[in-house]
Amino acid sequence: MNYQHYRATTLGRTLQDTLDEMMERGDITKKIANLVLLRYDKSISTALKDHGTSNMSFTAERLETFRCCDNVWTLILKDAEFREDQHSLKVDVVKIVACLGTDNGNE
């Protein structure tokens, strides 16, 4: 399963804007734009699976909200601190979306 939430990243929004402009000019059809977005979803998921090796830890003062729907967990944390090696970042509120990393071998 390829999730679409990576489309909300800067790269994903820029891709969507570019595809919208190309459709407005008549350079591509909506069907082609959708195929590009589906390929983007799959490529991002594959790249993170194959090359995402960074480790990070975090703590939070409070777990404000949590929910699970269709194997997608959403967590809202208050007063969180993220640490990686010598770097740390403190934030007032953070939203974490965690998805099932495999599709039971059906890729």
Swiss-Prot record:
Q: Subcellular location, in the record's words?
A: Nucleus
Q: Supply one GO BP term.
A: RNA polymerase II preinitiation complex assembly
Per the record, the major location class is nucleus
Cellular component aspect of the GO annotation: transcription factor TFIIA complex
**Is Cytoplasm found in the keyword set?**
no
Q: Which GO terms describe its molecular function?
A: RNA polymerase II general transcription initiation factor activity; TBP-class protein binding
Q: Does the keyword Hydrolase apply?
A: no
Alphabetically list the UniProt keywords.
Nucleus, Transcription, Transcription regulation
Show the Pfam families listed in the entry.
Answer: TFIIA_gamma_C (PF02751), TFIIA_gamma_N (PF02268)
Function as written in the Swiss-Prot or TrEMBL entry: TFIIA is a component of the transcription machinery of RNA polymerase II and plays an important role in transcriptional activation. TFIIA in a complex with TBP mediates transcriptional activity.
The record's similarity note reads:
Belongs to the TFIIA subunit 2 family.
- What does the record note on quaternary structure? TFIIA is a heterodimer of the large unprocessed subunit 1 and a small subunit gamma. It was originally believed to be a heterotrimer of an alpha (p30), a beta (p20) and a gamma (p14) subunit.
The name this protein goes by in its record:
Transcription initiation factor IIA subunit 2-2
**Natural source organism:** Drosophila melanogaster
